[in-house]
Curated annotation (Swiss-Prot):
Single annotated GO MF: guanyl-nucleotide exchange factor activity
Record keyword Transport present: no
Organism: Dictyostelium discoideum (Social amoeba)
Biological-process GO terms, alphabetical: early endosome to late endosome transport
Classification lineage: Eukaryota, Amoebozoa, Evosea, Eumycetozoa, Dictyostelia
Stored PROSITE patterns: VPS9
Name by which UniProt lists this protein: Putative uncharacterized protein DDB_G0284213
Amino acid sequence: MDEDLNHNLFFKTIKFKFPKIFNTIESKCYTLCIPQSPSLYRMNITQKIVESHVFIESKYYQSEYETLNKESNYIIDNGYIMEKENNNKKVKIMFDELCYNKDYKSYRLICIEEPLTGGASGLNSSISRSESDLGDLLITQGIVKPQRPTFDQATQFFLLDSISTNINTIVFRKANQQLEEFERLHSINSKTDVDFFRKDLLLIHNRLMDDLVCANADFKQLHSNEKQMNSLSLILESYILGKIQNKLYGDLKRLYEKENQHLYEKMIYLSKLSFEDIGVKSDFEPHLTKAKEVIESFNTGINYINNNNNNNNNNNNNNNNNYNNNNNNNNNNNNNNNINNNINNNINNINSNNNNNNNNINNNNNNNNNNNNNNNNNNNNNNNEIIITPMDKLLSIVQGSREIEESIKARAILELADEDDILTITGDDALPLTAYLLIHARPKYLATDLAYCSKFILTDIFNSSYGYHLVNLIAAIDYIKSLDILSPTKTTTSSNNSRNTSPTSSTTNITYGGNSESLFAQSSVNNSTISSPKQPEDEAALFNNLKKSLSTMNLNPPQQSQQQQQQQQQQQQQQQESNFYSNNNNNNNNKTFNNSIPPHFISNQNSNNNNQFTSTPNLFNNNNNNTNSNNSNNNNNNNQHNSRYSTMSFSTNISNNTNISNKYVKAPAVISLDDDSDNLGDFIGKLRDMRDDEVIVSTHFK
C-alpha cells in the first residue's frame, strides 16, 4: 500500500517551513522528490536539502532534470533516479502522484526509496518504522530530537547544529548568568527546601522556554503542537539541569545520607535472595543479562565526576613529582661540583655535560610517563558514559526494560514459538523486575536518585511511556523497602544456632513492611561506625548486627513440626492422668493461684485444655507432691518454651506446699432431697454408697 504523502514529514516540512519553495513548485510545475517516511530517520531537513530534491525539467533532453540549487543533474529511467555524472548511484521510485495548482496546471510528486542527499549514513531504508515510532525520534518541521537528552547533546542541539545558532547563543548567554546566580543563592538543607528549589528552577525553565520560542522562528512554529513542545522542553531541561548538576545532586546526597546507607545495606542482603524470594518469575532469568549491564550505568554520572577529580589529583601529583625530580637533580649537580672543585676544568666540563644529559633523559622519561597517565585517564573518561540529568537516569531504566523485551523476542524467533507461548511482561512482572535490577546494580545513592528523578523532571511526561517507567521506578524502590531482609536459609540457620532444642522455624519469609526503616535505624544506632560493606566478612558482620536488633522485637512464634506437637500432647496426657488420681488426697490443702500471669503467655497447646465440669480454664498443669520431679521438669520445659516468644520476664514457679486441684475425677453425683420423708431412707443409703465420691445435694420444697 502506497504511503499517504500528506502525512510525510518531508512533504509537511516543505509546506510549512519553506512555503516559498512550495509555492514555486506549484506555480512553475516543477517535480518534487519526496523520500519515504522510514528513510527520514535522524535526517535534518534544511533548505539546501529541500532544493536538491526539486527537479526542473531540461528544455533540451527528455527525462533529464536539474535541481533547484543548480548543483546536480539527474536522469529518470526505468523506475530509477540516477545521477548524470555517476550512473552507479541509483534511487528507486516507489510511486508518483499528479497534482494540480489553482490554475489547474499539473505538477508531479515522486516518492523515492531514500533521500538523494542528506540522509543518515549507514541507514537501511528497507527497515519499516511505524508513524508513532517516527514521532518519538523526530520533531516535525525539521527539528531533530536527541535520542538520549544528555547535557552534551542539548548543548550541541541549541548552540552547534541549530540553524539559528546566533539567536540561541544570545538567549543562552543570559540563561547561563541566571543559572549561576541561582546556584549561588539556593541550597537544599531540608526536605522542605526541595520543593522550593524545584519551584524556582521551574520558573527559570519556563522563562527560558518562552525566550527561545519568541526569538527563534523555527521554535515558534512548534507552539501549536503540545507533543513537539514537550520534546523541546525536554532538551532544554537537560541543558539546565546539566549546568547545576554538581550543586543539586551534592545537596541531595547530603540530605538523604542516612537513607542512602540504609538502602545500600539492605540491597546487599537482598542480593543474596533467589528470584522467587524477590517476586521475579524464574522464566525471566535468561533474559536479564543485558538488562543488568544497562542498569549498571545508573551510577556512571557519579563515577564520571569522581574520575575528573582523580585526574586533577593525578595531574597535580605529576607536577609535584617533576618539581621534586628537578630539585633533586640540581642538588646532585651542586654536590658533584663541590666534590670536583680540585679537578681540572676539562674533567668538570665532562661531568657537567654528563649530568645535564642524565637530567634531560630523566625529565623526558618523567614527561612521557605523565603523558601516558593523562592519556590513560582520558581514555577511561571516554569509555564512561556520562549520566547527569534525571531524565537520563530514567532512560537507563527504560533501556533495561527494552533489553528484556528484545531478548524475549529474539528467543521466541529462534525457538519458533507460538504467540500464545511467548513470555510477556505484565504490570505485575515489571515491578519486581525493576526492583531486581536495582538490587543487583546496588546504586550507592538510591534515595537521592529517587528524589532526583521524581522531583526534578520538569517536563510533563506522565502522558507518555516515560511517565509509566517513572511510576514503576518509584514503586520498585518502595517494593525494595518492604522486602524481607533475611533469606529463608539464614533464618533457619540463625535460629538453630541460638537454640539447639528449639522447634524448627518456618521457612516462610517474614515481611516487616513499614517497620523496615526502624529496623535499619536500630542497626545504625547500635553500630554507628559501620561503613559500606565491600567484603564478605563485612557483610557477615552487618548480618550479625541486624540479627541482634531483631532479638529485641516481639515476633510471632514459628510453627512447630508435627512430630514435636505429638510429643508435647503425649506428655500432657501422661501428666493429666497422674494428676487425676492424686487430687483426692490433697483436697484439704491450701490452694493458691498466681493470677497475675496472663493466659496468652502460655503455649497454644496448653491454653485450650479447659475442664469440662468447671468454668475455670487450666492455666497450667498441677503439681503433686508424689510427682514433684516429673512436674518440675515439665514446668522448666514450659518456661523455656514461653520465654522464646515473650519479651517480658516473669516467674511461674509454685512452692512445694501449694497444691492446685480444680479437677474432678468424674462428674459429681446429684441427689435430690424433697420434703417427702419417704425418700429420706433412700437418700441415706445412696449417701453411704457414695461416701468416697464428690456429692452435691439439692433440695426443693413444695
